[in-house]
């Protein structure tokens, strides 16, 4: 295993401004600037998800009752299908032609673009999911941003918390070093068309470029690359 590189020195330290330029959601998700999230396209993904409930509430205020069935802080597009037994907790927006299966659990401020699928037993927490992405079944995705056409096979997980160590702060890999996000809860940013095989795990802080494939049963941990 290669030696862990932690960015601490003045030479290798990436300041906040450089991080925002280097880790842009728009570099991973092509359609973000034309989406409802366009105003936040220049945020880092951890900035976006760290305030997910309020951001979803802001989007809720702009929706039309003509197209969405709104109940409290939950909005479901009239073309979406939500099966009996799904658990929905607001704030939450479910977009056009989405399918939410029985046993799915959505909570903590989530936004789903069009044609998304959240399968049986899948849990989505404080996350933003772009068009055509699918959580097959028995998945967990926490505090994450998934690009368009992302697919998670059965049992694949995106972890959002470093419970294995005393310092819970999540790091991301930028260039040849690690950068602290300053957050204790951040899962991953998955670019358009990324794929996670069955029972694969992405550790907190993953930044997966468009088209990345993580094989079945594999662990991707940016701190061990």
Identify the residue ranges that each predicted region occupies:
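A generic local structural motif
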Residues: 68, 86, 104, 175-176, ...
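Conserved short-loop catalytic and cofactor-binding motifs
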Residues: 36, 86, 104, 138, ...
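Terminal amphipathic alpha-helical/low-complexity segments used for targeting or macromolecular assembly
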Residues: 1-73, 78, 206, 210-211, ...
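Short secondary-structure boundary/capping elements
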Residues: 108, 116-119, 182, 186
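Short hydrophobic/aromatic-rich motifs at helix boundaries and adjacent loops
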Residues: 68-69, 85-87, 119-121, 183
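Glycine-rich hexapeptide-repeat left-handed beta-helix
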Residues: 5-11, 129-225
């Amino acid at each position: 295993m290669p030696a862990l590189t932690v960015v601490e020195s003045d030479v290798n330290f990436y300041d906040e401004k450089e991080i925002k330029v280097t880790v842009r959601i728009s570099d991973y998700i092509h359609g973000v600037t034309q989406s409802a999230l366009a105003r936040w396209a220049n945020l880092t993904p951890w900035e976006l998800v760290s305030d997910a409930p309020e951001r979803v509430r802001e989007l809720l205020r702009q929706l039309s009752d003509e197209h969405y069935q709104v109940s409290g802080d939950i909005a479901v597009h009239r073309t979406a299908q939500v099966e009996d037994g799904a658990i929905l907790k607001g704030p939450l927006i479910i977009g056009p032609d989405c399918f939410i299966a029985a046993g799915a659990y959505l909570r903590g401020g989530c936004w789903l673009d069009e044609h998304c699928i959240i399968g049986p037993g899948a849990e989505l927490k404080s996350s933003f999911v772009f068009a055509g992405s699918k959580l097959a079944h028995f998945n967990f995705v926490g505090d994450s941003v998934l690009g368009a056409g992302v697919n998670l096979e059965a049992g694949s997980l995106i972890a959002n918390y470093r419970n294995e160590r005393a310092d819970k702060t999540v790091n991301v890999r930028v260039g040849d070093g690690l950068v602290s996000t300053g957050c204790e809860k951040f899962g991953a940013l998955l670019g358009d068309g990324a794929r996670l095989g069955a029972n694969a795990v992405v550790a907190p802080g993953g930044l997966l470029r468009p088209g990345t494939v993580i094989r079945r049963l594999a662990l991707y941990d940016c701190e061990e690359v």
